[in-house]
Amino acid sequence: MNLGDAISHASTLFMPEFLFGADEAMLIGERSANEEAIHLLVEEFFANPNPGFGFDLVIDLADRNRSLCDMMGPESVQADRSRNLANHLSDDDILRGVAALQHRKVEKVAQEVQGMNATKGVLYGSKPAKGTFVGIDIETTSTSPDRGYIVNVGWEVMQLAEDAQPSDAKSVFCGIPDQYAETGVPLSEIHKITWDDVKDKTPFREDAELHKELLKALKAHPFMAHNAAFEDSWLMLHLPGYAEARKEGKIIPIDTRDICRALDPEVRFMSWEAKPASLEAWAQRRGILAADEEERHLGLDDTDLMFRTLIAELKERNLLK
């Protein structure tokens, strides 16, 4: 598939009833085409100042793909992962995030990287952190942003200071299609969100007021998330206006998992199986959670845990200004 094919595919009128009774191979083929088109369109949108299409075309295709996945069932959806979930933020994103965290110019941070082949540890530890940030966490029905739904989102604003208290906290449960009343909320074994939590709630994609409020918060301050590439990938395909603001540099993501790996020396001596950079393990090492205490896996709770753990880490490394 080339870019022209992707635009044509995304622009085609979709009639779900044409796929009723289709075998699994046909459904998987259609899903694969959708996801390849999304990938090509996202790449072109960010690479080209004038891509020739609006990002609403991409979001509409992602909506279409979710409807298709609802027809396939959760087992097929979770069997593999869409290519539209990023594994990490880009190098440019990391430079912008470090600059925002340390209140420095991006160009200055970039010069340091070129001059000393700086590792992430050197970057994050080179200057104290300061300022005000918005933290966010989402809970979803899939790992793939073009296959599942956001069922919970929480965010709050925090200043990076030892005795700081959060402000402007918000937590919202979001609805999903009625078919999940019988089958249950996918990934509930992780986030413990049940049908009763989302029953009669407005779906995220349909909540215009939530879109407006969340986009405003994300543009007001750089945002932090633990594995920020996850939130970034999901918001890209769910929140209208997010991709445009990201492209314009009005939204800056910062990954606290990167900060954990860069600053906490214990991570390097722990096994991969122990998930040393997980929020739960990090919070336990910094004494924010007890050794037998677990992460909640709810948006606002995890956001607050992330901020408290980050501040404890920065204090431990003498990086709080």
Question: Which stretches of residues belong to each language-model region?
Answer:
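Acidic, low-complexity, intrinsically disordered interaction modules
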Residues: 40-42, 46, 50-83
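Short alpha-helix plus adjacent loop in nuclease-associated cores
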Residues: 254-273
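Conserved non-catalytic scaffold segment of RNase H-like nuclease domains
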Residues: 112-240, 276-286, 291, 297
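A short alpha->loop->secondary-structure connector
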Residues: 239-250
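Acidic, divalent-metal-coordinating active-site segment for phosphoryl/phosphodiester hydrolysis
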Residues: 298-309
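N-terminal accessory regions of nucleic-acid-interacting proteins
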Residues: 7, 19-20, 54, 65, ...
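Mixed-charge, glycine-rich, non-catalytic linkers/tails in nucleic-acid processing enzymes
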Residues: 310-321
